[in-house]
């Protein structure tokens, strides 16, 4: 794979029954890219997110092109999907803490090593401890409590609600909890389908800044053009089952699209002029004998 490439789809076909949803899809995710997927309602935007998330499988095109999905190592993909918390009696805090299970396991092992190192000078123990410390820092394991509380405050959820059962929240509130859980998980590739739904303006403005500086990749489907303009740097448009990549935010995409349409219309006009010129020439000369034919007729 190319340098900084996290994820790549090559020549994918997605169809349900005999209905083609996406055809010959080539899609790339580079490190730290913020990507929007745009297109008309029903064109396959959410279908593409589901393909990336692994919820559905692609079909292979009937061609000689190499088809498939490739990733740079193991990529953790997180998808803000339709909320479906199965354990309704679990508190919000208990649900959120599931994200930090690797942190807690790492912390537990570090405490065990600390006790072992009190009575042993084994360098292997020290090396393992150093590795675990580095892992804790990479997972933001030393600040998980603060990160969790900050997220809840940003999303307008009171800290006392951490003790409430998930089932006692409305659908919109549960969506917020799911969103907080995803952000705290910090996946390598974050998939967001209409992320600004159920959010007030201050939260949206905070989210814009957070995603823009997020140090991993984000893929967004949203009708909020202002939000996209603030966050994304790449746009993929799905049109007539196919997909095209544009560099820049939503406004830049629209400008490039308009310029392409103007060029297309100009090329069409030039083509029609050439067709007319050739047609007129043929009409003018089709019944006129050539010099060779005239000579032979003598």
Language-model region placement:
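ABC ATP-binding cassette signature C-motif
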Residues: 1-268
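Intracellular alpha-helical coupling/juxtamembrane segments of multi-pass membrane proteins
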Residues: 256-278, 282-298
């Amino acid at each position: 794979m190319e340098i900084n490439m996290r994820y790549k789809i090559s020549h994918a076909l997605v169809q349900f029954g005999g209905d083609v949803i996406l055809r010959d899809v080539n899609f790339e995710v580079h490190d730290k890219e913020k990507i929007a997927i745009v297109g008309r309602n029903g064109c396959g935007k959410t279908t593409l997110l589901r393909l990336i998330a692994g919820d559905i499988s692609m079909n292979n095109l009937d061609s000689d092109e190499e088809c498939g999905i490739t990733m740079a190592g193991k990529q953790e993909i997180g998808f803000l999907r339709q909320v479906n918390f199965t354990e309704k009696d679990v508190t919000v805090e208990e649900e959120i803490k599931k994200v930090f299970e690797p942190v807690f396991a790492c912390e537990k092992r570090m405490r065990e090593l600390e006790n072992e190192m009190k009575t042993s000078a084994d360098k292997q123990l020290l090396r393992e401890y150093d590795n675990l410390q580095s892992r804790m820092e990479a997972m933001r394991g030393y600040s998980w409590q603060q990160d969790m509380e900050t997220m809840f405050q940003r999303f307008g959820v009171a800290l006392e609600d951490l003790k409430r059962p998930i089932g006692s929240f409305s659908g919109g509130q549960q969506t917020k909890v799911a969103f907080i859980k995803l952000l705290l998980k910090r996946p390598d590739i974050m998939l967001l389908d209409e992320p600004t739904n159920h959010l007030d303006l201050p939260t949206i403005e905070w989210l814009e800044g957070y995603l823009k500086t997020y140090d991993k990749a984000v893929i967004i489907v949203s009708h909020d053009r202002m939000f996209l303009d603030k966050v994304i740097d790449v746009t993929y448009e799905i049109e007539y089952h196919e997909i095209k990549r544009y560099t820049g935010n939503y406004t830049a995409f629209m400008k490039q699209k308009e310029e392409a349409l103007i060029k297309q219309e100009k090329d069409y006009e030039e083509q029609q002029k050439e067709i007319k010129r050739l047609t007129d020439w043929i009409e003018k000369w089709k019944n006129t004998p050539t010099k060779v034919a005239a000579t032979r007729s003598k």
